[in-house]
């Protein structure tokens, strides 16, 4: 058993002993290459070789697994046919209706078309916007595959498989670029398009004695006239544009639809064929009242298009204000 004296001596020696020697600091050059143990960054060449082989093998196998998984995934996809369509897709089976021109990008949430017909600079945004939107319809080369796939369709002459119907821009007059889309006459043209839904087949209102009660009277009369004179055109998705409220209906004035009052049925179903462009309807407001906001609602009419003003289903809303 140690004595008190021995304990004191041990404590004294421990307290006053020389601290352990620390390794000398290495210079940057020695950190890169240490000639004493022939190492690079603290590892020998053999150690670096083993680490390199491990990571090359690890990431090589990982990349191969990812490539195999991606290859298997893409085998389930078709570049032209969506995996999920109609009821199984997020888009659903009720196409929406869109309009052009749109307000400036800094006011993207607005639906107001407001300008002065007597000032070119004031309505220039709207006509330029239509120029940009309609460019693909005027120059087939802007749409891949359109130049060689165009087919002159008709109601009795649908497009063959792999070809697309031509959109005849000559039938839009006076809603043309050369005529400033009639904006300078305070009688603007608004273009309507139906959103594309792959595989959707419209169910037409093609009998004048079987039309919905809420269809505008003017459209009912139009369908009855088509039934008498051009029955082959009854397979059409009809279009109507009216004032939303009684005051709007009074102020909207006469409305003309070009080339016809709807989207021809031979453009459907949409099959994502190369070069396809959606058909358009030019809505020409011939005499809208100036100096007052006119709320306009346009609807697309087919048996399988549902309308809901609150949800904007099957219809589109915008306002006109011409000073």
UniProtKB/Swiss-Prot annotation:
GO terms for molecular function: ATPase activator activity. The keyword Transmembrane helix applies. It comes from Drosophila melanogaster. This is Sodium/potassium-transporting ATPase subunit beta-2. Glycans are attached at residues 180, 206. It is found in: Cell membrane. The keyword Transferase does not apply. Disulfide bonds join 153-165, 175-189, 241-298. GO terms for biological process: cell adhesion involved in heart morphogenesis; establishment of glial blood-brain barrier; intracellular potassium ion homeostasis; intracellular sodium ion homeostasis; monoatomic cation transport; open tracheal system development; potassium ion import across plasma membrane; regulation of tube diameter, open tracheal system. Residues 72-323 are extracellular. This is the non-catalytic component of the active enzyme, which catalyzes the hydrolysis of ATP coupled with the exchange of Na(+) and K(+) ions across the plasma membrane. The beta subunit regulates, through assembly of alpha/beta heterodimers, the number of sodium pumps transported to the plasma membrane. Residues 1-50 are cytoplasmic. The gene is nrv2.
């Amino acid at each position: 058993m140690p004595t008190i004296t021995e304990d004191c001596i041990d404590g004294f020696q421990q307290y006053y002993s020389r601290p352990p020697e620390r390794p000398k600091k290495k210079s940057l050059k020695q950190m890169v290459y240490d000639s004493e143990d022939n190492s690079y960054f603290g590892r020998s060449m053999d150690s670096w070789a083993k680490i390199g082989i491990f990571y090359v093998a690890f990431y090589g196998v990982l990349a191969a697994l990812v490539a195999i998984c991606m290859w298997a995934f893409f085998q389930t996809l078709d570049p032209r046919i969506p995996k999920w369509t109609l009821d199984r897709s997020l888009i659903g089976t009720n196409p929406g209706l869109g309009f052009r021109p749109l307000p400036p990008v800094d006011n993207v949430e607005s639906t107001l078309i407001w300008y002065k017909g007597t000032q070119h600079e004031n309505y220039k945004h709207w006509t330029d916007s239509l120029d940009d939107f309609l460019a693909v319809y005027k120059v087939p080369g802007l749409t891949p595959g359109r130049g060689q796939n165009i087919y002159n369709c008709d109601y009795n002459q649908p497009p063959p498989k792999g070809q697309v119907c031509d959109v005849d821009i000559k039938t839009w007059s006076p809603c043309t670029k050369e005529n400033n889309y009639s904006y300078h006459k305070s009688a603007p043209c608004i273009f309507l398009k139906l959103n594309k839904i792959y595989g959707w087949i419209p169910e037409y209102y093609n009998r004048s004695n079987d039309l919905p009660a809420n269809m505008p009277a003017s459209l009912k009369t139009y369908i009855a006239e088509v039934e008498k004179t051009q029955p082959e055109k009854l397979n059409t998705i009809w279009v109507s544009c009216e004032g939303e409220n009684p005051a709007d209906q009074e102020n909207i004035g006469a409305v003309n639809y070009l080339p016809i009052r709807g989207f021809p049925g031979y453009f459907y179903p949409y099959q994502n064929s190369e070069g396809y462009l959606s058909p358009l309807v030019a809505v020409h407001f011939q005499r809208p009242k100036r100096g007052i906001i006119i709320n306009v609602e346009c609807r697309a009419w087919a048996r399988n298009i549902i309308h809901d003003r609150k949800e904007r289903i099957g219809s589109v809303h915008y306002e006109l204000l011409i000073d």
